[in-house]
Regions:
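Short gly/ser/thr-rich secondary-structure transition/capping motifs
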Residues: 5-14, 371-375, 454-460, 492-500, ...
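Hydrophobic, well-ordered secondary-structure elements that form the walls
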Residues: 254, 288, 311, 323, ...
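A short helix-to-beta-strand connector/capping loop
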Residues: 316, 448-455, 491-494, 562-568, ...
């Protein structure tokens, strides 16, 4: 038994319509894409629901569940609740959640103008307003018959949820999905009874909420709202609050979010990026609390139980909603209530989890390979069968390997050639806007130092040392080093490494040319722009390939920051030389250019440090595992962590 002393407000039960939630924590709606292409419940989906419930939340919400599976969905493999045959799978999910300690909700949604559409099957929307200012696409402005049809679909899906044993559902009125499209002046250009004034724009969404309430009078209904859309001419706080005041007649919880999934910069608030501050929507929730009678839930860059306790105790919200924090560490609640909050793995806000949806793949995490897995590492190795494993490299991959191996019970010797752990992540976390990644790095180093591995710093590993140590297995995680190509003038004093610049080890003057349009170069450019420098970024690749591979919402945010700080981007420029006058380039047409500056920053990518790996792979028939950047170029933090974890659990 654990006394409720650390977080007394968080663990105060909440009863609504006879349904008691054991605490004030909700696992936020997330799109996990673990159902079949037809939306049928799979064993993988059931396992994921069990994993979510075991986090310790009061209830979890399955995100973005379309009310018209073929026409209103945004992704393949979303949960299908649109036919009675789906009730069986829903019931299994709800039962699985309850058996593992949580209630389960489903977020009923219609993507409106963002739905999958074809010429013969256009997307339904209040008006024919295109997405992100792009081409119109196939959109049909809804008539009364369309509205009646969609309203009935919300009702029918809610009834199926009730028949499946769910006690709570969510209606998605946020992020410029269909109901929010009616609310927003940016997407509702109608001139009839459903457009123009706020009263008219509320008419259809309120009619849906009213119909659902009448159909399921005993269910708890949560309504998700964007406090503001962060979109030109979009919904603002005051009108949103007025809608919430009207909506509370039909719903039991108002859930405060923010943003517009269908407008570039507005989308960066729906799934907040690493540039966003903490507790993004708490001030909005506090305003809602002043005007609403029903409980208020709040989501958005909330990362800990301590924050949740402070929010609830201050009366700013009744329920605190998180998702990424639990994805990063499913034991966040359990560690925190036992007084070990410092051991909670912090989310980096890299959005590798959300980006999976854009590629049609299921949910995953860059720093937590255990996401969704019911796996006890301590049981994988039988007593007496422990191995001695040599881990070479103290970057993210090496640290993940060491921690995983130690949890399995193996003896671990970790070797790092420099005087500190972290590898190139030390450079990647310097900028002020990299706080979340910096906290993760600090956590990773602490956990590695405390895991019981033998740590050998300032030790370069050779094949002879491996032979001398004579381990049972070796994990090579030697990482990569910055590219320093043989370009004329590259040794000039004006030419700086991105590492030296980011760590402020060298002056750069007021005008800077960053050579490299990858993520590292562009983040360096933003950092310099924040410091008031005039920055130009050049690369041989075309502009559309700048920061290629970066998760979508963070990419949008990064482009916004580059524009905000006046960074000039020049693609298609091959560097031919450096001189005192500038960086000399030639474009695809053969035209020469010169970009002057006080400093030229090299951010031309990295190359694998794989010489040792190749030697060991050729010398030993087995027992050598190669992970992370030393495998190939173009790797991410996620690659290092995932590969190191899976290499470690293969050693038994």
């Amino acid at each position: 038994m654990i006394p409720n002393t650390r977080y007394p407000h968080v663990f105060q039960p909440l009863t609504i319509r006879g349904v008691t939630f054991k605490n004030r924590l909700e696992y936020a709606p997330t799109v996990v894409l673990k159902c079949s292409p037809e939306g049928e419940v799979t064993q993988e989906m059931l396992d994921y629901v069990a994993w979510q419930a075991k986090t310790g939340v009061g209830y979890l919400t399955i995100g973005n569940t379309p009310v018209v599976h073929t026409d209103s969905s945004a992704w393949v493999c979303e949960l299908n609740v649109t036919q009675d045959r789906c009730i069986h799978g829903l019931e299994m999910m709800a039962r699985t959640a309850r058996e593992n300690g949580a209630e389960m909700s489903v977020e009923l949604a219609h993507a409106g103008r963002g739905s999958n559409s074809t010429p013969g099957n256009p997307a339904l929307a209040p008006s024919d307003v295109p997405l992100n200012g792009g081409p119109l696409g196939y959109i049909k402005p809804m008539n009364e018959e369309d509205m009646a049809f969609v309203r009935q679909q919300f009702v029918d899906c809610a009834v199926r949820c009730q028949k499946a044993g769910l006690k709570i559902i969510m209606i998605h009125c946020a992020h410029n999905n269909l109901l929010a499209q009616f609310l927003s002046p940016a997407s509702n250009h109608r001139t009839d009874a459903y457009g123009g004034s706020l009263e008219n724009r509320m008419r259809f969404p309120l009619s849906v909420l009213k119909a659902v309430r009448e159909a399921v009078p005993n269910m708890v209904i949560e309504c998700r709202c964007s406090a503001q859309e962060d979109t030109p001419d979009g919904l603002q706080l005051e009108e949103s609050l007025q809608f919430m005041e009207r909506a509370q007649e039909y719903v039991d919880i108002i859930h405060i979010s923010r943003g517009n999934i269908f407008f570039n910069y507005g989308s960066t608030y729906t799934i907040p990026t690493y540039f966003k501050g903490r507790q993004l929507n708490v001030a909005f929730a506090a305003e809602a609390k002043k005007r609403l009678k029903v409980p208020v839930a709040v989501v958005g860059n909330i990362t800990s139980l301590q924050e949740a306790e402070e929010i609830i105790s201050a009366g700013k919200a009744d329920i605190v909603v998180m998702a990424k924090a639990y994805m990063a560490d499913e034991n966040l609640i359990h560690k925190s209530i036992r007084g070990h909050a410092e051991d909670v793995r912090p989310c980096t806000r890299c959005d590798w989890c959300g980006n999976a949806n854009n590629y049609g793949t299921s949910m995953r995490c860059a720093i937590n390979p255990m996401l969704g897995k019911d796996l006890d590492l301590t049981t994988l190795v039988k007593p007496g069968e422990e191995k001695h494993v040599m881990v070479i490299g103290g970057g993210p991959g090496g640290m993940m390997a060491a921690q995983t191996l130690r949890e399995m019970g193996h003896r671990v010797s970790l070797y790092e050639k420099s005087d500190r752990l972290g590898g190139l992540l030390n450079d990647a976390t310097v900028a002020s806007f990299k706080e979340y990644m910096r906290l993760y790095l600090q956590w990773d180093i602490r956990q590695t130092m405390a895991c019981g591995a033998e740590i050998h710093l300032n030790t370069a590993v050779t094949p002879e040392l491996v032979e001398q140590v004579n381990p049972d297995a070796v994990i090579v995680a030697t990482g990569s080093s910055y590219v320093h190509p043989p370009i004329p003038g590259i040794d000039l004093e004006k030419v700086k490494t991105v590492s030296d610049v980011e760590n402020h080890r060298t002056p750069v003057g007021e005008q800077v040319v960053v050579c490299g349009g990858g993520i590292v170069g562009l983040e360096c450019a933003v950092m310099l722009g924040m410091e008031g420098k005039k920055v130009t970024v050049i690369d041989q690749i075309p502009l559309e390939k700048f920061a290629d591979g970066m998760p979508v919402f963070n990419h949008i945010e990064l482009n916004h920051q580059l524009e905000k700080y006046g960074v000039t981007l020049e693609g298609g420029q091959k560097i031919t030389s450096f001189d005192e006058g500038g960086v000399n380039t030639v474009d695809a047409n053969g035209t020469c250019h010169c970009y002057p500056g006080d400093a030229y920053v090299l951010a031309l990518g990295v190359k694998p440090d794989n010489k040792l790996a190749q030697t060991l792979l050729s010398k030993y028939a087995g027992g050598v595992y190669v992970v992370g950047d030393c495998v190939s170029t173009g790797r991410l933090l996620a690659d290092a962590n995932q590969e190191a974890f899976h290499a470690a659990i293969r050693i038994r």
